[in-house]
Amino acid sequence: MLISANEMCFSYAGESLLENIHFTLNEGDRVGLIGGNGEGKTTLIRLMLGELYPEQGEIFKKSGARVGYLAQNGGYDSYNTVWEEMLEIFAEDHRLLKSLSEVENAISQVPEGGEEYRRLAARYESLNKQIAARDSYGVEVKIRTVLGGMGFADRTEQVIHTMSGGEKTRLKLCRLLLEEPELLVLDEPTNHLDVRTLFWLEEYLASYKGAVFTVSHDRYFLDKTVRQIYELEPKKAIRL
């Protein structure tokens, strides 16, 4: 279980917005949420994220669960280039590869069979195991795959600060996909996608290892990417 709500209620400005909400999100779930404007979809997300708290009932989140959230128009600003920003996600992989290179260099300068050689060889083996487990050598391929799919293949050296709001939102989605959180929460993710990037995202999410919770008005996109859908009617959620 990643997130579970039981008899959850929430009011805004004295008006009841959500009443007796029940749902459970498990590892690997694909859930969609639809509903009209003002019926509490974003409020429900904020309750899930712990940004708001229910007035009645309970909501539980798995301890230590990594959650990635794409808000509507939820881009971010940075003076890094696109490539620099994506590489930051894999700082540990960079550290491991750098350490391996340093150990390789050190091994080449000590006699074989000695105590220092054995110590370095053990360190080399340990680093190699960590790198293999994390697929650190595949980092650049991962980044180029996601950036290419989302339309940034030829813009890796562009400074993020110079981009439009829609482009920054798409780039935030790229970052979330590369971070691979246990739960990916997407609020209207198709707003800034063209047909090509939309199709690519549908295919990518099909093989995503974590759980995905998507709010969208695009029912076709939901039908392609989720396994169950809730409709948020006034004050309650109903599974379709």
Predicted regions mapped to residue ranges:
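ABC ATP-binding cassette signature C-motif
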Residues: 1-240
